[in-house]
Amino acid sequence: SELTALIQTDMIFDRLEKMRDVFVFACFTGLAHCDVAGLTKENIITDEAGQVWLKTHRQKTSEVVDIPLLEIPQLIIKKYQGMKELNGKLLPTLTNSCSNLYLKEVAVRCGINKTLTFHMARHTFATTVTLSNGVPMESVAKMLGHRNIRTTQIYAKVIKDKLAEDMNNLATRICGDYSIQTSNIAI
């Protein structure tokens, strides 16, 4: 998958590695660029059961979001922990426009034939990471900071559209490979 390619591809330049890491972090947290850029270590909380959480306010809506952190975002945080040039920030972020420029290079390096934008990370979290893996829509809505579940349902429609497209492509590929005898069936 494209997400696997992003995670596993070796980046030849430090700036591209940092960009890729921040983008992958967003793919696994669903945060918008401005929200990732504002994170500090104070946003990371470990509860009494040992679960690591990311707690922040969405800049766009002021909604509080609590996101249980999977292993990949935790590893990315550890990778950049203590870097002096972060000036107290959690991750090495750039402006949104500069990030999108670097993401074009990251996509080429990973063999992804589309223009990556930072907002695609949020979309990837909603579709590829959560909804496609059975996370309930209500939980996804809460983690994305959606006030209205209808906003989250847009992502679910994208998944249904993609499923239909994939099955239609499959039907085209296997057309004629299988047949069923219908002469004895009364209609």
Where are these regions (language model features)?
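C-terminal catalytic core of Y-nucleophile DNA break-rejoin enzymes
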Residues: 59-78, 84-105
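Conserved tyrosine-mediated DNA breakage-rejoining catalytic core shared by Y-recombinases
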Residues: 1-7, 38-78
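Basic, Lys/Arg- and aromatic-enriched nucleic-acid-binding interface segment
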Residues: 1-33, 133
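C-terminal secondary-structure termini that scaffold catalytic or DNA-interacting sites
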Residues: 83, 170-187
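Short basic/aromatic active-site micro-motif
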Residues: 18-22, 93-97, 113-133
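Catalytic-site neighborhood detector that most strongly recognizes the C-terminal catalytic loop/helix
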Residues: 58-62, 96, 144-169
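Acidic, low-complexity interaction regions
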Residues: 94-97, 105, 110, 182-187
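C-terminal catalytic core of tyrosine-transesterase DNA break-rejoin enzymes
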Residues: 24, 28, 34-35, 105, ...
